[in-house]
Amino acid sequence: MAKEVITGAEALMRSLKNEDVKTIFGYPGGSIMPVFDALYGYTRGEKKMFDHILVRHEQAAAHAAQGYARVSGEVGVALVTSGPGATNTLTGIADAMMDSTPIVVIAGQVGVGALGTDAFQEVDLVGVTQPISKWSYQIRRAEDVAWAVSRAFYIARSGRPGPVVLDFTKNAQVATCEWEPVKCEKVTSYNPYPTIDEKAVAEAAELINNAKKPFALVGHGVELGGAHNELIEFLEKADIPAGRTLLGLSALPSNHPLNMGMLGMHGSYATNMKTQECDVLIAIGMRFSDRITGVPSKYAPQAKIIHLDIDKAEIDKVIKTDVAVVGDCKQSLPAITRLLNKNVHREWRDSFEEYRQQEQEKVIEKDIHPTEGPLLMGEVTNVVTEATHNEAVLVNDVGQNQMISSRYFKFTKKLSIVTSGGFGTMGFGLPAAIGATFGAPDRTICCFFGDGGFQMNIQELGTIMEQQAPVKMILLNNNYLGNVRQWQDLMFGGRHSFTHMMNPHYAEIAKAYGIPYDVVIDRMDLQAKVEKMISTKGPYLLECAIKENEDIVPMTLPGKSVDEMQLELNY
């Protein structure tokens, strides 16, 4: 029987269906028009297979794909044209690479005959994206589409996830081929799931069994591996207190008794201080970023280090490891747990409380329960998380809003934090939140941003308007680039070099997009207006006029070790 002959563009549609793609975030243009023409028939009527979300800027397509991936556990997809359309996605691709987020970016490209001629909207996308993606490939023939798409999704989602780029030449889109579906199940020289070393597992278990002061660092890898239950069984059997990285905040419920708080520069006081006292440090699916370690040479100097990670490249990259267990933590954690003795470390656990009380009295109470003065970011976050019964997805932008909302938001469900961790991309929050509403349509999506980050992708209010995406937007407006301003006060003599911002009338902007809006100036109105936002169907923008010069504490200053964290800043 003869095989069906179809175009490369049609082959792309069928290949995406085979990968169970449901939502595509995109923006059409010249060199991707054949694909969008094929897409037309698959987004309506009886043949409908996909929802296409028309963003207002290609950067937003990449970030929306990230948000979708982070809350759904599936691969996010962005579809854009060549040249500036493709290069506009670079920040999102780099961000996804840093945070191990599985997305596939499909970009149009000029025809093969025009490659290398500086044709209109031509760019060497493969060359540009190779350093910031897991795999970047140019499709030059229609018959290669099914193979390339299947391979792209396999690489994006397997092992340590990440972004993949497909550069789709226009001639390959319109040329025909015999359709035959392809399912990629392995790639030569690519080993995404290393075999776990039983000797390393035994060594790790022995160190933990003999530890008097064990401490676990819970990272994004737990979420990516779906190892939430395995983590809890591991921690509870050996009675190990744990700190969570920024990206690992929802890997362990906030109310779990072994959760001691967030790690990092603006993390919890106890988790940072106790890192320097533990005798065995178990890092699970995290990469020892500089925001966690402070000065690496001074980090946990007394501890034996056990590092569990799926990516061998992370072992010994920053912190010297005593025992490395390379592999998927969904397998490595139970392998270690089976060898653990049932243990109790009550005195060690209780010792965290002294530091927690200090932070509670000097920082937390002042942040979330102020009685006078302007609104504070912490109290806004606290009211929002309580209004959602601690069950919402937190999406945030970058800056002070990111740190404060991550500190005070509470997590009871997995896959509940969407943030730009490694790359620190301002403008990430709004489009990522849009993606999250499609990736987790049954959940409440709360997006915090400052006036700086909001305006970097403010055009995506158009996407929210068109889709009626139910993003609950909380604008923390202090008329400053707050994080930079704080550093200027600390390290540059208080010279606020271009960090004060003149802002537009956000009420008028919301009105123009048909988005419900309110503003909170007096804290007496905060509770009622937050509850109104949460209960209102569809999108909502709540502007909060917060203190202009609010600082984020605790803070570990650059060049300091984690036990030099300060509860108060001295200018």
Label the predicted regions.
Residues 1-347, 383, 387-390, 470-473, ...:
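N-terminal alpha/beta PP-like core and its mobile active-site loop of ThDP/TPP-dependent enzymes
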Residues 2-3, 143, 206, 302-398, ...:
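Phosphate/pyrophosphate-binding active-site segments
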Residues 9-13, 17, 35-39, 356-437:
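Active-site diphosphate/adenylate-binding microenvironment
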Residues 29-32, 83, 100, 163, ...:
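Glycine-rich phosphate/pyrophosphate-binding beta-alpha loops
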Residues 58-63, 86, 401-403, 522-526:
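Short acidic loop-to-helix transition motifs that present clustered carboxylates
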Residues 106, 114-121, 316-318, 324-326, ...:
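Thiamine diphosphate
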Residues 165, 307, 395, 448-449:
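Generic enzyme active-site microenvironment
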Residues 170-173, 401, 548:
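Short, internal active-site loops enriched in acidic
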